[in-house]
Amino acid sequence: QTLNRLYTAFATLDADTMATCYAEEATFDDPAFSLKGRREISGMWHMLCAATLTKNRADWRLEFSEVRADDNSGNAHWEAFYRFSVSNRLVHNVVEADFIFTPDGLIASHTDRFDFWRWSRQALGYGGWVLGWAPYFQKQVRVQTRAALTNYLAKHP
């Protein structure tokens, strides 16, 4: 099943296998990223997995549960434990994921929901506590993650 393959690969930071779970024209949305196409989604997973493998592998752990899917859609609960590379702070992110599948079982749409303010307080400390609730701050995070992904994709075509 696609979702078990995705999260099993994520747990071991295997971005190559994760990328094979997505359709060519897939979309991905969460509070930090809004992506279109397998290239961008694959690039995000490769960028995040590479950063964790390089800098903070010992702090990484992923747990997933409540994986449900039929031929058309699915959902899962997952929790990531990691060290945020920008601040070197430990984060425990709790995520609910929703999926829509193509007829051949690949992910056409992937939406992750998590409490952005909770995440920002853990990842950024005081600054996240003060600003993490503000839509402007979340927009700025999206701008920064988009720039980081664009830079990564330029270096890893």
List each language-model region with its residue ranges.
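Short, low-complexity N-terminal intrinsically disordered segments enriched in polar/charged residues
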Residues: 1-20, 24, 146-157
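Hydrophobic alpha-helical core bundles mediating ligand binding, dimerization, or RNAP-core interactions
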Residues: 3, 10, 22, 45, ...
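A general structural-boundary detector
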Residues: 5, 28-31, 85-86
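Hydrophobic pocket/interface hotspot
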Residues: 6, 18-19, 26, 37, ...
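A solvent-exposed, acidic/Ser-Thr-rich amphipathic alpha-helical stretch
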Residues: 15-19, 23-74
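A beta-strand edge to alpha-helix "cap/lid" segment located at domain peripheries
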Residues: 53-56, 63-157
